[in-house]
């Protein structure tokens, strides 16, 4: 595993945006298009809600369940679970990361949700469950663009995947029901139990996690790492976008009237998310810097803590609160804001590498 004593990777000479794949580069655009298609579909065919609800798994229609499961599966098949054995190589760094991801991150999102959305319980809850979903996908891209520690990031992603199964449900119940009661705040207006959340996590994270692990270890053994990384994942990985966009189309087709009547709802959710990404990035970078982790490790710590697993947040919100809920709506705004903000923070990270760590290489072009 790379450590802080190793040389910092040379920054890319190609523009940061140019290094992203077409799908990742225009993710906000694809999401906006999916929203628009969904709203249009709902207006043209108002009976579509009944079609989607004809078959269901619990409270989730079968088509939506398939979309939710599929958008998680390729992401989890990409995680390097075999790297978990390297945790002992950087115990201090992993301890700091777990502290940032599972204690500070959820608490910061909880605070921002209540500050900005005190009178919007649905949106507030959606933000809180988004803050609990630690990033396991896009962080690999941000880390690579910023010249972070790729090995450490891979292990951390695998660790967060496992921790989400264990910690997501109790932490969600804690921040939605217990903490508001302690602080004398109004609790969520939806009557939920820890089992309601756990059931959603077990289905929509547990199933694709198991499938991803089986897929990875089976094909690594049968075909080898090179085939898996260069042949299978380039084909399988992008299909996660199909599941995500399909889910968004259906969500917005079922609440198009509400969206047209209240277009500023997107802005209500976007503002605290923007604060969250920026706060977590600088807080994490500052902590890593004073801990003398070096640039590569500091960048990885920062992007891991500042990013979120919006696929899991969407799945939990839809399964627990319903596809037309404010909670589900709020989780969809996450990737809209995260992608452009994190691209900007990559530039900030590279600038900090020069200012705080003495890098003299030229910055990448902006476009």
Model-derived segments and their meaning:
Residues 1-78, 82-306, 310-367:
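Alpha-helical transmembrane segments of multi-pass small-molecule/ion transporters
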């Amino acid at each position: 595993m790379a450590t802080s004593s190793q040389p910092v990777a040379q920054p890319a000479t190609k523009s940061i945006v140019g290094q992203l794949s077409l799908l990742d580069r225009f993710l906000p655009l694809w999401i906006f298009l999916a929203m628009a298609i969904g709203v249009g579909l709902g207006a043209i065919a108002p009976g579509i809600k009944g079609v989607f609800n004809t078959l269901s798994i619990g409270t989730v229609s079968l088509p939506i369940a398939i979309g939710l499961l599929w958008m998680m599966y390729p992401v989890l098949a990409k995680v390097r679970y075999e790297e978990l054995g390297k945790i002992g190589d950087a115990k201090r760094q992993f301890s700091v990361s777990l502290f940032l991801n599972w204690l500070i991150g959820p608490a910061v999102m909880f605070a921002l949700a209540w500050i900005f959305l005190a009178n919007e319980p649905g949106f507030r809850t959606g933000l809180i469950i988004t803050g609990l979903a630690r990033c396991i996908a896009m962080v690999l891209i941000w880390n690579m663009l910023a010249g972070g520690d790729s090995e450490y990031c891979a292990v951390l992603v695998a660790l967060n995947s496992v921790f989400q199964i264990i910690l997501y449900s109790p932490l969600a119940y804690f921040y939605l029901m217990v903490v508001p009661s302690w602080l004398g705040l109004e609790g969520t207006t939806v009557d939920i139990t820890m089992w309601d959340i756990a059931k959603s996590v077990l289905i929509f994270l547990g199933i694709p996690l198991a499938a991803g692990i089986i897929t990875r270890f089976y094909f690594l053994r049968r075909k080898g790492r090179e085939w898996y990384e260069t042949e299978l994942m380039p084909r399988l990985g992008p299909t996660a976008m199909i599941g995500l966009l399909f889910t968004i189309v259906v969500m917005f087709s079922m609440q198009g009237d509400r969206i047209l009547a209240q277009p500023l709802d997107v802005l209500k959710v976007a503002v605290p998310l923007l604060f969250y990404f920026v706060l977590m990035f600088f807080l994490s970078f500052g902590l890593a810097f004073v801990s003398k982790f070096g640039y590569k490790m500091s960048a990885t710590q920062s992007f891991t803590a500042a990013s979120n697993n919006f696929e899991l947040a969407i799945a939990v919100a839809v399964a627990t609160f319903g596809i037309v809920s404010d909670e589900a709506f709020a989780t969809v705004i996450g990737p809209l804001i995260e992608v452009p903000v994190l691209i900007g923070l990559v530039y900030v990270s590279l600038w900090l590498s020069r200012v705080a760590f003495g890098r003299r290489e030229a910055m990448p072009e902006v476009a």
